Amino acid sequence: VGTSAVDLGPRLAVALAALTVLAAAAGRLSGLGQDRPVAVAAVRATVQLAAVSAVLLVVVRSLVLSALFVLLMVGVAAVTAAGRATGLALRSAGAARRVGTAAVPVLVGAVPVVGLVLAGGTVPLRGEAVVPVAGILVGGAMTATSLAGRRLREELAVRRGEVEAALALGLVRRDAVHEVLRPAAATALVPPLDQTRTVGLVTLPGAFVGVLLGGGTPVQAGATQLLVLLGLLAAQVTAVWTTVELAARGRLLPDVPR
């Protein structure tokens, strides 16, 4: 099978510009007021991916540099998850503690899965393989942590009285939070579960398309996508579980009743 990689030329630039204009126009004409955020996001993504692509040309040649790059991704993921989960700005007091706490579910979700696929030889121990796989899993764990933390925070704001009532009945904080808030955190798993259930029927996700565009066979693409999907599911379920436990112990959200 020959390569079907995207052509890097003027036509790509025109297509990207047209897609950005389409998204921005829809954001404006719909009344959502998202035209500027869409344009900024598109420019930012272009700059970031260009920079990352240039860096990765060097990074993936060395396992040490690849590991350092993965650590950088974890750091960015922790900062993002901390902000989304707590709703507090990075510049506010206690930011370092919140970022450190948010890094825990990201690491607990991603590290075992990365270790498993590397130890089993499914993914070769080379930079060009480790970085993208680790990036996908870290990103998935980050999203799960952000969504679970945000849902816990929103649910706590609405059902705070129920948590306090459970505490008044003699439950310890961990059990009270589990009883009242844990079901809300489970909604963070709806996107990965839906994606896994409908893969091949409704969607052809990124890994599948990437392998095909890179010249792989449909069987190779399917096997790669299955590995990614199940790895993501494991990482995200573990990340949500860890997020709930941290919140129940008062380490993630600042105002959980005691």
Language-model regions, residue ranges each:
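Transmembrane alpha-helix interface motif
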Residues: 179-258
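Short cytoplasmic-facing helical segments at TM-TM junctions of multi-pass membrane proteins
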Residues: 151-188
